[in-house]
Amino acid sequence: MPVITLPDGSQRSFEQAVSVMDVALDIGPGLAKATIAGRIDGNLVDACELITQDASLQLITSKDSEGLEIIRHSCAHLLGHAIKQLYPNVKMAIGPTIENGFYYDIDLDESISEDDLVKLEKRMTELARTGYEVVKKTGSWQDAYDAFTERGETYKLAILDENIEKTDTPALYHHQEYIDMCRGPHVPSMRHCHHFKLMKVAGAYWRGDSDNKMLQRIYGTAWADKKQLKAYIVRLAEAEKRDHRKIGKTLDLFHWQEEAPGMVFWHNDGWTIYTELEKFIREKLHEYDYDEVKAPMMMDRSLWEKSGHWDKYADGMFTTTSEKREYAIKPMNCPGHVQIFNQGLKSYRDLPLRIAEFGCCHRNEPSGSLHGLMRVRGFTQDDAHIFCMESQVQAEVKKCIEMVYDVYGSFGFEDVVVKLSTRPDNRIGSDEIWDKAEAGLAQALTDSNIAFEYLPGEGAFYGPKIEFTLMDCLGRAWQCGTVQLDFALPERLGATYVGEDNERYTPVMIHRAILGSLERFIGILIEEFTGKFPTWLSPIQTTIMNITDKQAPYCEKVVKKLKENGFRAKIDLRNEKIGFKIREHTLKRVPYLLVVGDKEMESGEISVRTRSGEDLGKMSVDDFIAKLSDEVKSRQ
């Protein structure tokens, strides 16, 4: 007679085994109608799952994050059902959930077009409206193999052969005549899957291996209700307008070429943003007492073997050979910084030693994963490594946290999600060291009044870490900053210091990045500001325009004075109507537009407009310089 304990502490007793849905029905028909799945003793299960003994139970609905995930996964199966009806010869591969949606990889001789997506979505809608029940059947490995052999599903057979033990009992989900294999859980019926949209088609290699066949990947999104779906579509449209690749092209900031995949060609205005950002971070490095260094971009294989990168990260490194020696272009800066620390005897009095570098790194990212500035092969990290004693770790971490928030606040990022990743199963070091390290990071966050959540088991094998994720104006998450403890690398590379007792000790190494990579952070800024950078960061801060040729000499004097005062100023003396020139430079996102006509020239003034269209009226050139100077210095 199972006794079911609900989240509010109430209990319900039953005379015999009951399913999750039975419990929901016992509570009320409204809840049963909303129930998608359940969590029995912490384990997520289907609504049809039987409870045979006393257990705790949480009923999952579309209001729960798990419920939405299940809806999305079931929509992937619904897509599979629709594809099979419209294209009977299609071979189904995998159909997982992703952020905000799902996809399904298919093997089909003909290409899926935009028109085909419309037809598929229509068929999905027709199927969902029937509200058919999703039936879960668990059987032997052979039962599943026979079912997919009969249907000619070669990819499902490969999954069975390569990923599922023959002693396992895989679950098959029956969507009328369509069958799919999955761990689940899934919705009990298609009544829960009505708010979806197919988004696009892309190519994807089977198993992510370029040696395998290229499949077609159909992406979709799914939500709990119509309002959420509509809001997401609106956000997507806004994100499209903010796409840094499009804005970068419009503003002539950078470009890419097939001859250098994942490498950025910076143009003058884009490089201006880059160097201003670097200058800003360099000022912060001086403020927070860092030494700036520059380590080689390429080092001998032997060093990467000692550091462990050759064993753990060889596929991600670009290598070359010269004079029978093998070299790797650095994918990260830490080994080079340890070499700098190792030059000369270090005493406890030298610690903490903070070493920073704008390190140019290269990683052999798969070509299919490259995405504008957000995912590149060549990038610059605002990287730093702090060598310190164990007793200094907590104080140093607090300084890192302070610097992170100082920098993010300068760009208006106030919504920062913080996570603390703790020890993984595969790790080095004693539990005592890990206890100290995790407690130290947690205490540093607490002392800094930073709310955070734990990510159990997500730390690196050599130490725990803090991750800082920026939430942008569209609610998108961008993981940028990290503060990570490392007990392994200093020891592997022979880093030591002499303690107060004249004994040698291995320092603790703190890896610290704030922007993550300059390229990616610039991409984030472009999308956050839609190219309307703060004045201090804008590649062109002001443009002066004449109304007739008569004012040209005066305009040239003004632009010369602006440049002499250190501003990035341009002049537009073209024989065009002033309205046309104003519109053009507004589209270029220039913060201040200066207009000169006869009246301004006679009074020695300028008319000032902002890119938002605000008319600031006439002012003297000196007053404008003072205004601009204050704005740039305060980094508004």
From Swiss-Prot:
Homodimer. SUPFAM superfamilies: Class II aaRS ABD-related, Class II aaRS and biotin synthetases, TGS-like, ThrRS/AlaRS common domain. InterPro entries: aa-tRNA-synt_IIb, aa-tRNA-synth_II, aa-tRNA-synth_II/BPL/LPL, Anticodon-bd, Anticodon-bd_dom_sf, Beta-grasp_dom_sf, TGS, TGS-like. GO terms for molecular function: ATP binding; metal ion binding; threonine-tRNA ligase activity; tRNA binding. It is found in: Cytoplasm. Catalyzes the attachment of threonine to tRNA(Thr) in a two-step reaction: L-threonine is first activated by ATP to form Thr-AMP and then transferred to the acceptor end of tRNA(Thr). Also edits incorrectly charged L-seryl-tRNA(Thr). Belongs to the class-II aminoacyl-tRNA synthetase family. Disulfide bonds: none annotated. Residues 243-534 are annotated as: Catalytic. The keyword Metal-binding applies. It catalyses: tRNA(Thr) + L-threonine + ATP = L-threonyl-tRNA(Thr) + AMP + diphosphate + H(+). Pfam families: HGTP_anticodon, TGS, tRNA-synt_2b, tRNA_SAD. It is an enzyme of class 6 (ligase). Signal peptide: none annotated. Its cofactor is Zn(2+). One of its GO terms (cellular component) is cytosol. Zn(2+) binds at residues 334, 385, 511. PROSITE patterns: AA_TRNA_LIGASE_II, TGS. GO terms for biological process: threonyl-tRNA aminoacylation. Residues 1-61 form the TGS domain. PANTHER family: THREONINE--TRNA LIGASE, CHLOROPLASTIC_MITOCHONDRIAL 2, THREONINE-TRNA LIGASE. Binds 1 zinc ion per subunit. Its EC number is 6.1.1.3. Gene3D superfamilies: 3.10.20.30, 3.30.54.20, Anticodon-binding domain, Bira Bifunctional Protein, Domain 2, Threonyl-trna Synthetase, Chain A, domain 2. The keyword Chaperone does not apply. This is Threonine--tRNA ligase.
